[in-house]
Amino acid sequence: MTNPEDPIDWRALAEEIGADPNRGGDAIARRAITSLLGDEAMRRAVDWYVEGRPAAEHASSVLRLLRPDAARSRCLEIYRTDPAPERRHLAVELFRVVARAEDLPLVGDLLADPDPAVQLWGMGVLDRLLWDGHVDADDAEPFLRMAERRPNPKVREKHTDLRAHLEPHE
């Protein structure tokens, strides 16, 4: 995190995040804010949420807006390595709001997880990727077919709901 007393060198920041210093936009702004806050702050925000600390939803909202790589990685690290089921569930729940299009293949891993709650949050990831416009129905199709075949009735129910929303309205 930068010292609040120091002015921001916007040109250096643009170079740091790989952006043309003469261009702007929401995606560039999110990367710049993430860079100013730092990866460690993003990882700590994930931990804050997973631990259920006060204002956890505030941390989630900031992470949802920024969708930083460090938060996505930390969510997956907790999901893959933490022995506590509740922490794994919360990590996947949070991953749902920070996931991006390139994370779509992870939906298959989540649906294949032996934990029914992780499977259901995997459907939440797919749902969010669809409705936030990160992926389209064609991209989601293999995972919808996978969900349809899962023995978990809640996953199949979520599959049915997603299919209904994806059908063209007449």
PLM features: residue spans?
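Structural detector for internal amphipathic alpha-helices that build alpha-solenoid repeat scaffolds
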Residues: 2-3, 15-36, 47-68, 86-100, ...
